[in-house]
From Swiss-Prot:
InterPro entries: Phage_T4_Gp38_tail_assem, TFA_Chaperone. This is Tail fiber assembly protein homolog. PANTHER family: PROPHAGE TAIL FIBER ASSEMBLY PROTEIN HOMOLOG TFAE-RELATED, PROPHAGE TAIL FIBER ASSEMBLY PROTEIN HOMOLOG TFAE-RELATED-RELATED. It holds the Pfam family Caudo_TAP. Keywords: Plasmid. It comes from the Bacteria. Belongs to the tfa family.
């Protein structure tokens, strides 16, 4: 079959086949080439052109220029993950173009990393504060658990009932354990040696 012949307005003045290069109507990204049959008086399909794009380049997408007059290469980082240099939060890139401002492709190693302009550095003060806070939470949880373990003994004491020797031993053991917890210097967190609770059971 003969090739189509077009006028200056890209309307066929002779019917036939023609190769067109299609691009997305939204972001103008090159999609594919196709052979189209044009009858006389018919133009090329929407979002297509006659000039071929250049060859593929790694890391780039091929887009039709904004004025639709040529092809251009645009950075393509879609699918990559970048990290906010302000918060360290990850973000997956879903659009064409350069990396977003105030991001880096380098992942922070800890929740306490701060960006120094070139790399992540650990904010040791924030890291230590978090460790101390976690230790305080753990200590209170251990104290609460210990207190729960002697709640029945405390109830008997409040009722004026006499404790058995085993109950007295358990009560003193738990109170000693709580004293050890309260005496801990948590400012050295996370390098702490937690006391072990003596497992004695009242009978």
């Amino acid at each position: 079959m003969d090739n189509a012949i077009l006028n200056s307005e890209l309307i066929a003045i002779q019917a036939g086949n023609i190769i067109v290069y299609n691009y997305d109507g939204g972001n103008r990204e090159y999609i594919s080439a196709s052979t189209e049959y044009l009858a006389v008086g018919v133009g090329i399909p929407a979002n297509s052109c006659l000039d071929a794009p250049g060859s593929h380049k790694a890391g780039y997408a091929i887009l039709r220029s904004e004025d639709l007059s040529s092809w251009e290469y645009v950075p393509d980082h879609r699918g990559e993950t970048v990290y906010s240099i302000d918060t360290g939060n990850p973000e997956e890139i879903t659009v064409l173009g350069d990396y977003p401002e105030n991001t880096t492709t380098i992942a922070p190693l800890t929740p306490y990393d701060k960006w120094d302009g070139e790399k992540w550095v650990v904010d040791t003060e924030a890291q230590h504060s978090a460790a101390v806070e976690a230790a305080e939470t753990k200590r209170q949880s251990l104290i609460d658990t210990a207190m729960d373990s002697i709640s029945l003994i405390q109830l008997k004491l409040r009722a004026g009932r006499k404790l058995t020797q085993a109950e007295t031993t358990q009560l003193n053991s738990v109170l000693d354990y709580i004293d050890e917890l309260n005496a801990m210097d948590l400012t050295t967190a996370p390098d702490l040696n937690w006391p072990e609770k003596q497992l004695s059971t009242a009978s």
